[in-house]
Amino acid sequence: MNVNSSSNRGEAILAALKTQFPGAVLDEERQTTEQVTITVKINLLPDVVQYLYYQHDGWLPVLFGNDERTLNGHYAVYYALSMEGAEKCWIVVKALVDADSREFPSVTPRVPAAVWGEREIRDMYGLIPVGLPDQRRLVLPDDWPEDMHPLRKDAMDYRLRPEPTTDSETYPFINEGNSDARVIPVGPLHITSDEPGHFRLFVDGEQIVDADYRLFYVHRGMEKLAETRMGYNEVTFLSDRVCGICGFAHSVAYTNSVENALGIEVPQRAHTIRSILLEVERLHSHLLNLGLSCHFVGFDTGFMQFFRVREKSMTMAELLIGSRKTYGLNLIGGVRRDILKEQRLQTLKLVREMRADVSELVEMLLATPNMEQRTQGIGILDRQIARDLRFDHPYADYGNIPKTLFTFTGGDVFSRVMVRVKETFDSLAMLEFALDNMPDTPLLTEGFSYKPHAFALGFVEAPRGEDVHWSMLGDNQKLFRWRCRAATYANWPVLRYMLRGNTVSDAPLIIGSLDPCYSCTDRVTLVDVRKRQSKTVPYKEIERYGIDRNRSPLK
């Protein structure tokens, strides 16, 4: 891609890196003025990632593998770092992995944020992160064959269903709080929802000592499906379906990744329309979570009222794109349909109505003593991890739309509720500005050139955090590799730290404050580390206890 070197970001960081590690960088390739991929010597991979992460304000949203044996004879691992210091940019650190040994040095001992990504690379490609502290499977089930790795190019057809290798659960749950505690899992996971998960809460009396959990029970294989059965244009509509709540955010992230790879300039009006729909999506997501927050503290009147107002955001989506869910609008290079004058006026009317409704509901919410009493001081997250890609790396039209960055110092459940309240009002203001200031440009860029094996990142600040996609184009209008990372993928690993030191009745509030992308955790295993006894109970029972705080499920 032709990038004007005078406007390239990250050059000072790369110069410092090359000085710190002479000869470490083997290759350097620009995707955009704000994205660069460097190939480094594999033995220096942990040193380079650690240096960028700690010395240059790096953040590690995503890492992934790729089977590039048909391109260069190797596998590859990519660590995508968001540089958030004075010079904001993306630096992707790549290392080639020998196809025979399949070994590469684990980054996790240096940068713990890499643990889930390296476990997934091990599952999906059979690569071996030497020194990885947690050797458990992440994505693949217990009964999956040891020598079958789904994302290898020669491994399997996505339709293959291998015979199970075991008929029992073998996943070892870990209790870091008390290594002597005996864990006795009771009963199988009973799947009653689309997205189940299995939690283990290790408790001493009512206090949570540690927590562990197993997810990925309904892994859909979307990346394999995209690479084998779809053209890169068709994947746009698959990306819409990654999540039932923030599907449009994934669609923007995916199209943005391909547009960055091919150097496509998206018309400004399309950028504005994308931003409008992203804020509509943020509205209905935040209002949903505010309603659930009311429910978790026993304030079901607030739950019903927030869901009543949320209906107006769904009406807004239907008005703008013809569907109550924000599906099917994006194309690579722009959007499929315009926002006409009558739609704009009706949307502005809904914005005014929602602002009045939400103001009244928030006043009622904050006047409910149980809300602050139950949510302050629990589920604390370190304030240093707070970030918002709309500000750090503006995309779509976020560089032009006025917006406010909201932070609360508590880092607890109450702070997360209040950030959603403030962002709801800000989304309404952003919608008004964008609808009143729509540029007069085309909606779609057409006639661009397809470049096999071009690649780039795309990203969006979804309601739950950042969605980050990476796309490498292949031959015949297909994708060679698509990495789709949802916001909750990065939120789950920190949950155990949020739960520690809190009580069992706090668990639903803490989990709900992340607004995780899963339908229901059907069962929770409670392990009493003092009595060395365990009990498996329905999650609804834990939720009930969190609301009324009577009849403990531990007894």
What are the functions of these language-model segments?
Residues 1-207, 367, 371, 427, ...:
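Terminal low-complexity/charged segments
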Residues 45, 112, 138-555:
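Metal/cofactor-centered catalytic core regions of large enzymes
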